[in-house]
Amino acid sequence: MSSTSSKRAPTTATQRLKQDYLRIKKDPVPYICAEPLPSNILEWHYVVRGPEMTPYEGGYYHGKLIFPREFPFKPPSIYMITPNGRFKCNTRLCLSITDFHPDTWNPAWSVSTILTGLLSFMVEKGPTLGSIETSDFTKRQLAVQSLAFNLKDKVFCELFPEVVEEIKQKQKAQDELSSRPQTLPLPDVVPDGETHLVQNGIQLLNGHAPGAVPNLAGLQQANRHHGLLGGALANLFVIVGFAAFAYTVKYVLRSIAQE
């Protein structure tokens, strides 16, 4: 923060915002970082990292706080710059911690308090002036798109170089993941009805490798064994049947002779 910022803002506002800046550096707000413009301490920019288990997860949301010269006795105005699906972009937001409600403002509230209140309202679904209604799917899409969007913002890149590097690393990881070849076997049905699978670099035909020819000799031997066994059983049945028939004829002839 340069000395020019002190000349533009009243002493009370400057001193208070400097204290808040030191406090927020010592005790950061969860999911949020903030920096004042080097040329104007009355304009702060912030970045919200989308919290886990919310539609904003993975997103980066850039916005700004405009403090009045009467701060901390009057509240700031809050704007969201990055498309997010919750608030309109570049529009004053109507929250209890903004200049829309000076009657509810508490001069003891710090920049950390303001940013915490903003995040709390962001993850809720209550309507207010400056809010919009979108599906969770849309919010997740905007979360993904927020990375590239913010990198195009000059002020964002100048004030938050660490976040910029974080975003670039995340984009690199996403690109590497999307460029990886498909490892799952994918069926490829050819006109003759055969199904080809590619697994571990080997094309399988109907579940077998091309060189995996069935053991014909083994199959023939098994078939021959089954044929011999079936023939032996058939002969056995014929012999038993003939013996039973001969015994029956002999019994009948003996009965006739006795009569």
From Swiss-Prot:
Pfam families: UQ_con. CDD domains: UBCc_UBE2J. SUPFAM superfamilies: UBC-like (SSF54495). It comes from Homo sapiens (Human). The active site is at C94 (glycyl thioester intermediate). It comes from the Eukaryota. Disulfide bonds: none annotated. Auto-ubiquitinated. GO terms for biological process: ERAD pathway; positive regulation of protein targeting to mitochondrion; protein K6-linked ubiquitination; protein polyubiquitination; response to unfolded protein; ubiquitin-dependent protein catabolic process. Residues 12-162 form the UBC core domain. It is found in: Endoplasmic reticulum membrane. Its EC number is 2.3.2.23. Residues 1-226 are cytoplasmic. Keywords: ATP-binding, Endoplasmic reticulum, Membrane, Nucleotide-binding, Transferase, Transmembrane, Transmembrane helix, Ubl conjugation, Ubl conjugation pathway, Unfolded protein response. The gene is UBE2J2. Residues 248-259 are lumenal. Pathway: Protein modification; protein ubiquitination. The lineage of its organism: Eukaryota, Metazoa, Chordata, Craniata, Vertebrata. Catalyzes the covalent attachment of ubiquitin to other proteins. Seems to function in the selective degradation of misfolded membrane proteins from the endoplasmic reticulum (ERAD). In cooperation with the GATOR2 complex, catalyzes 'Lys-6'-linked ubiquitination of NPRL2. Belongs to the ubiquitin-conjugating enzyme family. This is Ubiquitin-conjugating enzyme E2 J2.
